[in-house]
A protein has these predicted regions:
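Signal for well-folded cores of large energy- and translation-related assemblies
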Residues: 42, 84-85, 115, 119-126, ...
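Short glycine-/aliphatic-rich beta-strand segments at the starts of folded cytosolic domains
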Residues: 126-143
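A common structural junction motif
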Residues: 45-48, 155-160, 187-195
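Hydrophobic side chains in well-ordered alpha-helices
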Residues: 34-37, 114, 148-151, 182-185
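Short amphipathic alpha-helix segments
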Residues: 139-157
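Active-site beta-strand/loop microenvironment that shapes enzyme catalytic pockets
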Residues: 76-124
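Terminal, non-globular segments
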Residues: 172-178
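C-terminal regulatory domains involved in ligand/effector binding and gene-expression control
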Residues: 1-74, 179, 195-206, 211
C-alpha cells in the first residue's frame, strides 16, 4: 500500500474581490465518508452562496467526484479536482465555501479562485506519502548520538522513537528496498561500532516537500 494524501484535516480562508472563499480539506477513505463531510460543511455553512466540492478515494484513485453547487458548469469542482490530481493525492475531500461579495469573477476568475483555494490549502496543510517501510533499531553511545544527526540529514531520514538509558536506542524506518543499503551505511558511518536490529514493517507517513 502506497499513496499520497494530505498531512491532516484543515482549512484556509482568503478574500478575492470581496468574495470570501474557505477551503475545507479532510482525509476520507470511502465515497460515503466524503459525502458525509460535504453534507456537514453544507449544513455548517448553509448561508453560503456555494459549497463546491471534489474528492478522490481509493489507493489507486478509483473514485473521483466533483460538484459545482450552482456555479457555472466546469468552473469549480473540476478545477478543484485538477489540483488534487496534479499533486497525485487520493483519499481526500475538499469543499470550497464561497460567500459572494457582490463582484462577479467571470468563468476564468472562478476557475482561478476555486483551484487557487485548494492549492493554497494543500500547501498550508502539507502532503504525506503513506507507505510500508522497514524498521531498523539502532543502539549507540551518547557520543555517537551527537554525530547521528549528521547521518539522518545526509540520508534524509527521521528518527521516530528514541529511548535514553545507559545508551541510546532509536528506530528509523526506510523504504524496504533500501533497508540493507541503509544498514551498511550506518555500519560504515559508525566504523562498525553500532548494533542494528530489524524491526519488521509498519505503515508510516513520510512528509512530501513541495518545491
Amino acid at each position: 500500500m502506497e499513496f499520497r494524501t494530505i498531512k491532516e484535516d484543515g482549512q484556509i480562508q482568503e478574500e478575492i474581490k470581496k468574495s470570501r472563499f474557505i477551503c475545507h480539506a479532510k482525509r476520507v477513505y470511502s465515497e460515503e465518508e466524503a459525502r458525509a463531510f460535504i453534507n456537514a460543511i453544507k449544513k455548517e455553512h448553509y448561508k453560503a452562496t456555494h459549497n463546491c466540492s471534489a474528492f478522490i478515494v481509493g489507493e489507486h484513485s478509483e473514485i473521483k467526484r466533483t460538484s459545482d453547487d450552482g456555479e457555472p458548469s466546469g468552473t469549480a469542482g473540476v478545477p478543484m479536482l485538477g489540483v488534487l490530481e496534479n499533486h497525485n493525492l487520493t483519499n481526500v475531500c475538499v469543499v470550497v465555501t464561497r460567500y459572494f461579495g457582490g463582484i462577479k469573477l467571470g468563468a476564468g476568475g472562478l476557475i482561478r479562485a476555486y483551484a487557487g483555494s485548494v492549492a493554497l490549502a494543500v500547501k498550508e496543510i502539507g502532503i504525506v506519502e503513506i507507505k510500508e517501510q522497514a524498521g531498523v533499531q539502532i543502539q549507540m553511545s551518547y557520543a555517537q548520538y551527537q554525530e547521528y544527526g549528521n547521518f539522518l540529514k545526509e540520508h534524509n531520514l527521521v528518527e521516530l522513537e528514541t529511548n535514553f538509558t545507559d545508551q541510546v536506542d532509536t528506530i528509523i524506518f526506510v523504504d524496504k528496498e533500501v533497508k540493507e543499503d541503509t544498514k551498511a551505511a550506518l555500519i560504515e558511518f559508525f566504523n562498525g561500532k553500532v548494533i542494528l536490529t530489524d524491526q519488521g514493517l509498519r505503515e508510516v507517513e513520510v512528509p512530501v516537500y513541495l518545491v
